[in-house]
Amino acid sequence: MARKYFGTDGIRGRANGVITPELALKVGQAAGLVFQRGEYRHRVVIGKDTRLSGYMIETAMVAGFTSVGMDVLLLGPIPTPAVAMLTKSMRADLGVMISASHNPFADNGIKLFGPSGYKLSDEVELQIEELMDENIDRRLAQSTQLGRARRIDGVHDRYIEFAKRTLPRELSLEGLRVVVDCANGAAYKVVPEALWELGADVIAIGAEPDGMNINKECGSTSPDALAHKVREMRADIGIALDGDADRVLMIDERGHLIDGDQLLAVIAQSWKEDGRLAKPGIVTTVMSNLGLERFLAGEGLSMVRTPVGDRYVLEQMMAQGYNLGGEPSGHIIMSDFTTTGDGFVAALQVLAVVQKLGRPVSEVCHRFEPLPQILKNVRYRSGKPLENPKVQSTIADAEKKLNGCGRLLVRSSGTEPVIRVMGEGDDRDRVEEAVDMIVAALSIGVAA
């Protein structure tokens, strides 16, 4: 069954366009009913990033949850992985993160976590959607059974201690100068504080949110500012988080980008040497570079690919028994520690390797030579451009052009109206020609 509201990562769209107070109210009521358990008072934790619209959506969701008898614990601005962790730690029935992750400030979204801290399955999301479209007046709580809402103090300290416990107790970051870009988002308080507690010399940028500057020319979607700051401050490493801190990219001391594939290579090789891999391999998506696959094969490690989306990576990790997976965009999942992507915890694992080896980050974190990879986006307003016969014919012609010396991936984004066209192969010019053929056909189809 096609889903009406939920995409690959919750519900997401323009605030007061797609994500309205009415929608948030319905999500709160429907999810509250789905996650009621027995007769005791049910609890939901709600976190958010720093978007201006977060206040509006949070208030509407509180109304929805309390109207069906659920108590609400408000966490305030806090990373998405912290919400997942606290949902489980605080024995809540449900967790909510109000965020549009790496999207511009005008967008917002709603992510839901079950009592174990994992994102909801497609089946549960469909149950919630069905209730959202039903008249549930008769299922609202009686006046004496309405829920209560209150703000919870100390949640930042809980997450900081959780993150620090993922490192060996004796490990210190003393001697490391770290620039961290918090994207003016949910991590602006907790991550600089945690790095300082671990002994690092911390320089924070993107840590002055005003409700409208989240992800604006900063964070993991715009790492140039971080690269400049790392060089300016002669830092050892830079950490770039996104708006809700569930993904991370890094910068070496020379100002060069370290993407999610390279981070996975660093962690996988280190964990293999330490005997910490549950199975000899990792899980990635179809977007991961073939260079990573070749590197892992040289280490005797396999690489399982999934569709794009950290939820699909996690599903395969759980199904096949892997404890490390991720995406080139910087979603890194380490199931020994977390139930979802955690940008900061992933960064800590890399910092631990850097400290252990005592070598420059540029030597530690570039483990393989990536194959040339071209990624272009085509935005559309409506319809299904990929079903256009001319587009399909052009994709087939582009694949013939590569002649088995590379690969093409053309897909619709699950979070915004964009077609992503990715090409990869040993011959960059041939790959770019193939990608441009498809982009041109899509652009004509969109205009038509």
UniProtKB/Swiss-Prot annotation:
Post-translational modification remark: Activated by phosphorylation.
Cofactor binding notes: Binds 1 Mg(2+) ion per subunit.
Binding site for Mg(2+): S101, D242, D244, D246
GO molecular function: magnesium ion binding; phosphoglucosamine mutase activity; phosphomannomutase activity
Active site: S101 (phosphoserine intermediate)
CDD domains registered for this protein in UniProt: GlmM
CC cofactor: Mg(2+)
Residue positions, PTM Phosphoserine: S101
Top-level taxon of the source organism: Bacteria
Enzyme Commission code(s) on record: 5.4.2.10
UniProt keyword Phosphoprotein present: yes
GO cellular component: a single term: cytosol
InterPro entries: A-D-PHexomutase_a/b/a-I, A-D-PHexomutase_a/b/a-I/II/III, A-D-PHexomutase_a/b/a-II, A-D-PHexomutase_a/b/a-III, A-D-PHexomutase_C, A-D-PHexomutase_C_sf, A-D-PHexomutase_CS, Alpha-D-phosphohexomutase_SF
A GO biological process held by the record: peptidoglycan biosynthetic process
Catalytic reaction(s) noted: alpha-D-glucosamine 1-phosphate = D-glucosamine 6-phosphate
Keywords noted in UniProt: Isomerase, Magnesium, Metal-binding, Phosphoprotein
Annotated PROSITE patterns: PGM_PMM
Keyword Ion transport: no
Function text: Catalyzes the conversion of glucosamine-6-phosphate to glucosamine-1-phosphate.
Family as reported in the entry's similarity comment: Belongs to the phosphohexose mutase family.
Protein's recorded name: Phosphoglucosamine mutase
Origin species: Afipia carboxidovorans (strain ATCC 49405 / DSM 1227 / KCTC 32145 / OM5) (Oligotropha carboxidovorans)
